[in-house]
Amino acid sequence: MSCLFNSYDPYFKQPFGAVRAGQSVHLTLRIPEELGYVDPHLVIQKEGKYDVPVHYRMKFDGQTPKQNHFSVDLTLNDVGLYFYYFDLYPDFRRIVRGPDNCGVVSWQEGEKWQITVYEADFRTPETFKGKVFYQIFPDRFCEGVENKPMPFPDRLYQADKHAEPFWQPNETGGHLNEDYFGGDLKGIQLKLPYLHEMGVDYLYLNPIFEAHSNHRYNTADYLNVDPLLGTNEDFETLCKEAAKYGIGIVLDGVFSHTGSDSRYFNREGRYGEGGAYRDPNSPYRSWYDFDPKYKGGYRSWWGFETLPEVNEETPSFVEFITGKGGVIDTWLRRGAAGFRLDVADELPDAFIEKIRAAVKRVSPEKFLLGEVWEDATTKYGFGHRRTYLLGKGLDSVMNYPFKNAVLDFVKGKPAQQAAGEILSICEHYPAPAINTALNFLSTHDTERALTVIADEPANGRGREWQSGRNVSGEAYEEGMLRLRMAYAIIYTLPGLPCLYYGDEIGMQGYRDPFNRGYYCWDSHEERLKPVLAQLAQLRHSCEAFRTGALRVLRAEGGVLHYQRVGATETAEIIVNRSEHIIVEPLASGKHTEVNPMGFTIVVEENGHNPNHSYYDIQ
């Protein structure tokens, strides 16, 4: 039986994907005659405590050989998630979502399709669309000021830049992350020409605020740069110098918790006798929840006593972060292009909305990104479905589902599985959000992509097993080919590709701390750099990569073939994971060869007499 309905196919659903509130949706069913007489109804329900299913009778549109066609138009005015299927009267059969998103006939309840309805006025920064990101873990990128003194005596300087980050537990079984390789803001500034050559438009920096660990996710002072990285003036200079290369800087904001070793909490006493832990009358006391029922006597992030949680609904904390002259306002006016919110799915929607207001108050072109690991439209938290991607909160999110789909594909899983996972996110996310989603293969929180592709899974084996592991020989060579394919996909999907520092030279490592090694500036691994630079150049030159629609033409086995369709140009991408050359038909009717473990990109001008440009990047 042929497909009865597929929301990815424009024949069955228009427009594709999420819609603005008040926008019309057209749905079509294709019913085989073998099903007999049917009177199909759309059954759709908005997710909400008091919402009930609504039935729409579908009109008969005519026949084709052995098939009847029915359609319905509807307008969804209320923002939220809607779930739908089709009833086939007069009996109790229904059409539900089956494998590969195709509608199948069932006598029982089944999976439903989703429509995301977002705020009619939702916009994301135009200046970010079509651009390329580069993520830097500041302590491990480049040391611009050498032989600088440690600003605090409990920091350990690592002079050997090839050394492995500390991983062995201390005498109490903990990890203090006290080893510093000396990367700083001046070092980033020194490497701006290199980043420009790589086609980078924006830097995403892991936290730079004063904090007493090398990762700096335990903020000690929100308003000052960590002294080992430089000064506030150094940050402003970096922003100005980066702008000369067309590069903006997005900062990491950690607002769900602070450090216990901070001027706000001050458990360790580094900041005198003030702070919420030591002084019951501290102005910061109301930020935290002190109660004997908690380990250590206060609520902390996932039980880590060095990370006391803040109450993001406390008015003084909200004002400190989002008010005029507050944290957001201060850093954007110092030159930052936006913020990435750490653990955004653990922040209340109302707090995120106030952060958005603070960001957009400086400029609508400032960017607000959130860390969410799953489909951000279906995430639950605080007892309800989260709404931060529906137009009043985040501009977009980190796109972990794309990462997982792409890495699984280049490692050997079927292309149709990757295509389905990618299309699901594209369908669920508002267009302004999917066009600014951060697409990556590695981060400071995950194994490096080359390790995932070429080495064994850790499978729960600890740091002692992970330490010192690096693939070489044939495994390394094949891994680099697969990494090249993976980045070709990441650079050509909807959203903003993000290169994690060192991936371009094949750096390896399992999770923290092994994925946070110092950048090997003396590396001789050069083969991926020109490929990434060419992909960035292609993104900049072809408008289809800015906001073009995604259309999958073929996803079968080791072949992934898709288009990005823009207003004036169409880009066609064919990725061949197999070990032999394939000859693939293009949408234009022509054919192209694609090398084993390779990819080809064809850009075509839309119109009757198109020009073709072929990019077979070796």
What role is predicted for each listed range?
Residues 424-427, 500-501, 505-571, 577-580, ...:
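Glycan-recognition and catalytic regions of carbohydrate-active enzymes
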Residues 239-248, 256-257, 262-273, 327, ...:
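Active-site-proximal helices and loops of the catalytic beta/alpha 8
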